[in-house]
């Protein structure tokens, strides 16, 4: 008779334990019902990037002195810098500058170590193309001003899931949204 009683007691304990686990998981589900969704509907909604987001690299041709520091600090030797030495003024003259974003790992070393600050990271992250050769940007494509996510009124911008407090008198700008 005792083995039968211990079997019933084990069954009862397991039933209570299972009910407790189900109750705990249900409480977690209910606690998440009050939160905003994490996912967004991408083509129609875009999230605003943080201030230090490493997107497409912006290049200013006039500031570049062709020192090739960006090539030396790049872990994959990616930027291609073509220059010619002007003998009459004894300076380098930049002819061509290009970066292949199909290979770039967006580490930001080139931007950090550039002595003239001619390189900067933008908030632009839509670089997808159908042909990988279109990702090879020359100095004209790199010099193009970045498209702001906030400035595009055809889509709904989503600020990260945390509540961001922005004063109504300040214009909505990517520089003012830093409370991520």
Swiss-Prot record:
Binding site for [4Fe-4S] cluster 1: 64, 67, 70, 114
NCBIfam families in the cross-refs: ndhI, NuoI, PRK05888.1-3
Oligomeric and partner information: NDH is composed of at least 16 different subunits, 5 of which are encoded in the nucleus.
Catalytic reaction(s) noted: a plastoquinone + NADH + (n+1) H(+)(in) = a plastoquinol + NAD(+) + n H(+)(out); a plastoquinone + NADPH + (n+1) H(+)(in) = a plastoquinol + NADP(+) + n H(+)(out)
Cofactor: [4Fe-4S] cluster
Origin: domain of life: Eukaryota
Location of this chain's protein in the cell: Plastid, Chloroplast thylakoid membrane
EC number: 7.1.1.-
Transmembrane segments: none
BP terms from Gene Ontology: photosynthesis, light reaction
PROSITE patterns in alphabetical order: 4FE4S_FER_1, 4FE4S_FER_2
Keyword terms: 4Fe-4S, Chloroplast, Iron, Iron-sulfur, Membrane, Metal-binding, NAD, NADP, Plastid, Plastoquinone, Quinone, Repeat, Thylakoid, Translocase
Cofactor mode of binding and number, as noted: Binds 2 [4Fe-4S] clusters per subunit.
Keyword tRNA-binding recorded: no
Chief place where the protein resides: plastid
Membrane topology qualifier: Peripheral membrane protein
Protein name: NAD(P)H-quinone oxidoreductase subunit I, chloroplastic
Matching PANTHER family: NAD(P)H-QUINONE OXIDOREDUCTASE SUBUNIT I, CHLOROPLASTIC
General function of this protein: NDH shuttles electrons from NAD(P)H:plastoquinone, via FMN and iron-sulfur (Fe-S) centers, to quinones in the photosynthetic chain and possibly in a chloroplast respiratory chain. The immediate electron acceptor for the enzyme in this species is believed to be plastoquinone. Couples the redox reaction to proton translocation, and thus conserves the redox energy in a proton gradient.
Stated family: Belongs to the complex I 23 kDa subunit family.
A GO molecular function held by the record: iron ion binding
Binding site for [4Fe-4S] cluster 2: 74, 104, 107, 110
């Amino acid at each position: 008779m005792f083995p039968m009683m211990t079997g019933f007691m084990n069954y009862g304990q397991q039933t209570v334990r299972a009910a407790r686990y189900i109750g705990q998981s249900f409480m977690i589900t209910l606690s998440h019902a009050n939160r905003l969704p994490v996912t967004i509907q991408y083509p129609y909604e875009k999230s605003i990037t943080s201030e230090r987001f490493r997107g497409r690299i912006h290049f200013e041709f006039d500031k570049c002195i062709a020192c090739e520091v960006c090539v030396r600090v790049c872990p994959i030797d990616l930027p291609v810098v073509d220059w010619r030495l002007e003998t009459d003024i004894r300076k380098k003259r930049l002819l061509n500058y290009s970066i292949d974003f199909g290979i770039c790992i967006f580490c930001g070393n080139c931007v950090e170590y550039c002595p003239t600050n001619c390189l900067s990271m933008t908030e632009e992250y839509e670089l997808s193309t159908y042909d990988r050769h279109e990702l090879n940007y020359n100095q004209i494509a790199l010099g193009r001003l970045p498209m702001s996510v906030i400035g595009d009124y055809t889509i709904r911008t989503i600020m990260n899931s945390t509540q961001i407090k922005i004063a109504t008198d300040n214009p909505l700008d990517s520089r003012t949204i830093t409370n991520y």
